């Protein structure tokens, strides 16, 4: 985005902050695909056999200047005999550039927000998936109740357009947004069918992600406003920067109607000890107070979704649990607060007495059953967790097979190094390693035992069987006790921006 900042500022000064003319700019499409348009080919779309080049974009912009061809119908698959591309292909390019244009005002606001709060240098660490777990360790041991919240979706698309009107003042651009909605989804339905949403998300993943993030951003902004109104203590907003599109920083600027509608209701109670965390479509709300206040927040969420977003949500979709008795699933971990009882004997002169001290500790558990199901679905093992070969990879070279298994194993190891008990993690590594050996044995048409004897001389899998302890030994001396504590304790990686698809976050 930085390399196109000059062009954006120039276009904004010429067009008085209108977004509609940006659709006719070539650099927007270069920005959409992350390449420079000076190259001959800047995108290769998996869904099509053709490649989109600078010449194609120029032809597309020329076609859009003609009013009769401004809208490219996505369902029209007739090929143009002169250009050789169907209209669906051009529609895909337009939708990618269209999303970039929509993201521009939010990106500029987000950048200025980062500069004002002076957290730019910590931006990469906050984007890490593991950045939220240190907060859990610091805060959750002092809290009592937790509520699982699954954000309802889909929302009617006209509601999204009305919300966008507060942020985008360009009327022609909003009309074009409605046209995209009309042709990609079932516009006449009050509730968008799940099949249409699925097709829409596959054909336009960036567009779908933008709409979902904007909907969540609006919902969380209202929640932040309610949270600030419910207590005299000001809430320091925690910016969630772990999503792919980071235009939705938490802001306190909301429409005045919210203050008018909710001020009377929220004056009945105060709840200063509350924390809210979200990743993708699931969020959790943790509080120190009694379940009565948690039930009040539950009621607010239900009414907010039904009245403001016209999304039906039932109360049983939000579960309230006690942290000391129940665990909850979040970001691929089972988490609960474990109570450790310690007895201390004290003696004063001739009198002695015993004191019981209860220590709370956050327990992070690897969901071994869920991971085995994911590995079985990906054909690394059966449903019982017994490793099997990967026939699809048998045609690859030995180096590519080992490299793929090694990447998955390291990714699992990094992500679940924050576990309190490493035994489940070792089992996952065992499944992947033995599956790799069986895949190589299948390729070379040999038994596992004969292939392992051959590997002893060639040392082909020496890197694959290297444990994290060897990596830590490069930093700390082996005689140091720090090495053993690091290897057995929890380790959070603040540079972990993504994980593999085998880890289920929902």
Swiss-Prot record:
GO cellular component: chloroplast
GO biological process: mRNA processing; RNA splicing; tRNA processing
GO molecular function: RNA binding
Localisation per UniProt entry: Plastid, Chloroplast
Matching InterPro entries: Domain_X, Maturase_MatK, Maturase_MatK_N
This protein's record includes keyword NAD: no
Pfam families: Intron_maturas2 (PF01348), MatK_N (PF01824)
RNA-binding found in the keyword field: yes
Keywords assigned: Chloroplast, mRNA processing, Plastid, RNA-binding, tRNA processing
Taxonomy, superkingdom: Eukaryota
Similarity section: Belongs to the intron maturase 2 family. MatK subfamily.
Function in brief: Usually encoded in the trnK tRNA gene intron. Probably assists in splicing its own and other chloroplast group II introns.
Name of the molecule in the record: Maturase K
Lineage: Eukaryota, Viridiplantae, Streptophyta, Embryophyta, Tracheophyta
